[in-house]
């Protein structure tokens, strides 16, 4: 598996009960503003970590770069394969590739800074766009670490200029990354049915 076209989509509702409990496919959740959103229902199945490293989801990004998590991830999802990644991860990869081109430098996403499940303990019961696979925490661009207001603002302007569908979180005291997101985007693969 080396190209995004080789990813196998699966309906999250057809996964094991344990996986459904951790991923909560299609479940309605309420964000901090009171808006209701549905968690992703359709996922790409990733057979192994080696395949995640080999799979190019964009010219300069391997899938593994967008799904690296730490021990706060749900144990089942962290330690067993296959992994399941929301299909919208491909839209995020395409956006990050455009950002890399605009910044004219390699882009680095932090651990827990790409996709993480709704069960990840860093979420602390909150709704996180990371659970849709549509948010990225960028900690470095080229040789520049994004750990101060000036560097985050500089690359935030570049990120925001790429389109109205992108939201760039404003700098807050103590930030050590630039957060970008594409919203609550869900993808239904052509070969999948919502019925």
Regions found by a protein language model. Name each.
Residues 45-46, 50-69, 175-195:
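Basic/polar, cationic surfaces and motifs that engage anionic cell-wall
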Residues 91-124:
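Extended, low-complexity, intrinsically disordered C-terminal regulatory tails
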Residues 4-13, 127-195:
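Catalytic cores and adjacent binding grooves of peptidoglycan-active enzymes
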Residues 56-63, 83-85, 89, 117, ...:
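General structural signal for secondary-structure boundaries
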